[in-house]
Structures are given as structure tokens and as C-alpha cells.
């Protein structure tokens, strides 16, 4: 009856507004507050909105803590790899849109709430998914990324979109290799670019090169 009708109407409105809800947890946008001792997620999101409004970026990178603590504005006390940010990312005009502990569905929420609106970026880079591992199946991760990419494309139709595969993790190198193969296939089929970060961070034997990580076997230094 009425409830069914309401669901149909909501679905339609969501389609019109380009904020569809998927059926997998990776396709349902949600906020998060997993690291309140480090930073406030919603405050950072609001800072992003202000940043892109006041300084429309030429390029953006969306991601989790690996991106968050890399460099750029808004500033953060933790930094891994600031020199690389200053040398490569800043001259290329990148705005950092990374939030520590984000999963695919959290980036989806941020995209639905204005982080890619009101400006035209030449380049959008997406590096997300590692925090979904162990929680979601490989299929859900790939489908979540597909869903998120479509939301990105709707908001930045002229940007070139590049997906960076999941970085190798200690003791999960083989899993990362397999899922990146699936992600690459989906990304290229959908017409985006894929970059596999893995090879440079691994040793000959396929294990991660510990000297390139900060000690947790997950975050590059």
C-alpha cells in the first residue's frame, strides 16, 4: 500500500537527484566516526566543501588515511610522504579529499554531499577499498567501486577518472593481487583508467617491501 508507494517514489526521486541507493552495504552511503581521537570526519568534510568552493581544484584525489595523511590542505599533524605531495601532487593542482578509515560507502556519502559539485576538475583519482577488506566480499567491493565511479562520473562528466588499485598489505599480498585483477577488469570495462600500485611496493618474492611502509604493513612511508 502506502509504504510500497513511498518506496517507489523515493527510488524515483533518488534517480532524478543522482543519489541512488544500492542493495549492498558498499552501495549505501553512510557517515563514519571511526577515529575521533585523530580527527572529526564531518568537520573535515565541511572543510573540503569550503576548500573546493573557495579554490576550485584542477584535480582531486579521494581516499582513506593513505591519502588523508599524505599532504595538502586541510592540514593534518600526521604526515607520511609530504615531500612527494609537495613535489608531485601540489604542482599538478591536486586537492586532497582523503578521510582516515573511510570505506567505499563513506566516500559515496561525501560524493553525494557536494565534494565534487560546483567545479570542473580535469582529473579525479580514486584510491579506496582497503578498509572494506575482511568486511565485504570481493564482489561487493568491486560492485561498490562501480557504483561509486558512476556517481563520480555524473558529477564530473568531463574529468579523466583514474582508479588506483588496493595497495599491498602484509600477509594479504595474494588477496590484494587477486582483487586488483577484478577491479582492473571492471574499471577498464567501464571506460576508466586503472593503475596498479602493487609492483613498486613488493619484493621479488611477492611480499611487501617493509622498508617502504611505516611499520604497520599497510601505510606507505
Task: Identify the residue ranges that each predicted region occupies.
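A structural motif corresponding to the C-terminal end of an alpha-helix
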Residues: 152-161, 185-193
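Short, glycine/acidic-enriched loop or turn micro-motifs at the edges of active sites
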Residues: 67, 101, 199
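Solvent-exposed, acidic/flexible segments
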Residues: 59, 97-100, 138-145, 172-176, ...
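Catalytic His-Asp segment of secreted/periplasmic serine-dependent ester chemistry enzymes
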Residues: 2-3, 7, 170-221
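Oxyanion-hole/transition-state-stabilizing segment in secreted/luminal serine hydrolases
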Residues: 68-90, 104-146, 151, 155, ...
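Extracytoplasmic/secreted proteins, especially bacterial periplasmic and envelope-associated proteins
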Residues: 4, 8, 61, 102, ...
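N-terminal secretory targeting modules
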Residues: 1-62, 66-87
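Structural recognition of the beta-strand scaffold that forms the well-ordered cores
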Residues: 58-63, 93-98, 122-128, 132, ...
Amino acid at each position: 500500500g502506502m509504504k510500497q508507494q513511498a518506496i517507489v517514489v523515493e527510488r524515483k526521486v533518488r534517480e532524478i537527484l543522482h543519489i541512488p541507493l544500492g542493495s549492498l552495504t558498499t552501495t549505501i552511503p553512510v557517515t563514519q566516526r571511526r577515529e575521533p581521537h585523530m580527527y572529526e570526519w564531518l568537520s573535515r568534510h565541511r572543510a573540503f566543501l569550503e576548500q573546493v568552493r573557495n579554490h576550485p581544484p584542477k584535480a582531486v584525489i579521494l581516499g582513506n588515511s593513505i591519502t588523508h595523511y599524505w599532504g595538502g590542505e586541510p592540514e593534518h599533524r600526521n604526515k607520511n610522504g609530504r615531500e612527494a605531495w609537495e613535489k608531485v601532487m601540489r604542482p599538478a593542482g591536486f586537492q586532497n579529499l582523503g578521510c582516515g578509515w573511510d570505506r567505499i560507502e563513506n566516500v559515496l556519502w561525501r560524493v553525494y554531499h557536494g565534494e565534487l559539485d560546483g567545479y570542473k576538475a580535469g582529473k579525479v583519482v580514486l584510491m579506496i577499498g582497503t578498509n572494506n577488506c575482511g568486511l565485504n566480499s570481493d564482489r561487493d567491493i568491486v560492485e561498490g567501486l562501480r557504483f561509486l565511479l558512476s556517481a563520480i562520473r555524473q558529477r564530473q562528466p568531463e574529468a579523466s577518472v583514474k582508479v588506483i588499485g588496493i595497495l599491498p598489505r602484509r600477509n594479504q599480498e595474494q588477496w590484494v593481487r587477486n582483487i586488483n585483477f577484478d577491479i582492473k577488469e571492471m574499471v577498464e570495462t567501464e571506460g576508466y583508467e586503472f593503475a596498479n600500485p602493487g609492483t613498486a611496493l613488493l619484493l621479488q618474492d611477492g611480499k611487501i617491501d617493509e622498508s617502504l611502509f611505516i611499520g604497520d604493513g599497510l601505510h606507505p612511508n
